[in-house]
Amino acid sequence: MSSRQDKEKSVNVQVLLRCRPFSDDEVRSNAPQVITCNDYQREVAVTQTIAGKQIDRVFTFDKVFGPTAKQRDLYDQAIIPIVNEVLEGFNCTIFAYGQTGTGKTYTMEGECRRAKASLRCCCSFIMCLPLPKGCLLFVFLSSKYLQSGPKGQLPADAGVIPRAVKQIFDTLESQNTEYSVKVTFLELYNEEITDLLAPEEISKAALEERQKKPLPLMEDGKGGVLVRGLEEEIVTNASEIFSLLERGSAKRRTAETLLNKQSSRSHSLFSITIHIKEATPEGEELIKCGKLNLVDLAGSENISRSGAREGRAREAGEINKSLLTLGRVITALVEHLGHVPYRDSKLTRLLRDSLGGRTKTCIIATVSPSVHCLEETLSTLDYAHRAKSIKNRPEVI
């Protein structure tokens, strides 16, 4: 049997566990540590006290990254092989899952929250200037991921998305092949899908009017879904993707809560589609099509502890509802139930092919080491541990 046939067999969802360091607030309050990570044995131990008795629980994952792990450690050990699969023609999904404030966006994007805050203030101003559309915006945005480190290198805190982009183009540009790359970027907020790459209007009033138009989610007739009207941008190099990523990320909804100073209030899905034209030894033309879905989920949230009120409480409720549905889908797949509730939320409809479908999937579960987050940490660990049993059947497109 060929290696290609081997790869098309069913494979388990890969689950990584990442525990962030203590936050400054947790250090100041001397919060007890309840999580111990053993990266070598791929284990996470949780210590809790019930009725005066100490109980330890141990969870095993495909890979474990403790508080001292660097962004590059996670990427080099776990993500490089996935991106290589995309370049071979597979569809792959990587998504971060966990409580709010545990480092999902940091893991996926890197330390760019301050840049985003500046972008939110500047984007509307820039788009109102009497310049060719996007002229100054591209210069302003494209610099962020290339500012630090040696020329052509990413900053040390760059996350999965910029590292994957760089790997893709480094590989494509080193090969003597024809290729094309397209990207999309969407946000799911309160069960409404919006295009984060939608063209902006010069008029400020029109900008506010059109910036957040919800898009319909449609069945594609093949068991998957598509988003009607989603802008697909053709890109020719990594810098262009970084520009689009910054532009879209600046529009994502965030808010300060008691648990997270810049909490994502929406789920986001950044997709990269690659077509590669190759010639076989017989002189025939072969086209490979791979797709990489990079998902940053909003964090599950204890509404009373986060201090959410009114509109923020509704946001948190919608986030928790969609994540609860995701948990039910995981349970149904693991227990081989007859009905899997994909259609109960738009999040699970979007992720349908990534959970029990034709896509190779990697879940990065993020947790806090603090006792104050113990309940949410155990929930994340339980669901992530169960997700290891989900089987997908990847196909080359």
Question: How would you label these PLM feature ranges?
Answer:
Residues 28, 33-35:
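Extracellular/luminal ectodomains and secreted, surface-exposed scaffolds of diverse proteins
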Residues 2-12, 31, 40-354, 358, ...:
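P-loop NTPase motor catalytic core
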Residues 22-27, 194-195:
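Short, solvent-exposed loop/turn elements at domain surfaces
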Residues 16, 269-271, 363, 380:
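Conserved hydrophobic/aromatic beta-strand scaffold that supports enzyme active sites
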Residues 10-22:
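Short acidic, low-complexity intrinsically disordered linear motifs used
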Residues 20, 187, 298, 366-369:
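A short beta-strand-to-loop transition that corresponds to the Sensor-1 phosphate-sensing loop
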Residues 1-3, 25-26:
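Intrinsically disordered, low-complexity acidic Ser/Thr-rich regulatory segments
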Residues 223, 227, 244, 359-361, ...:
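Conserved GTP-binding G-domain of TRAFAC-class P-loop NTPases and closely related GTPase folds
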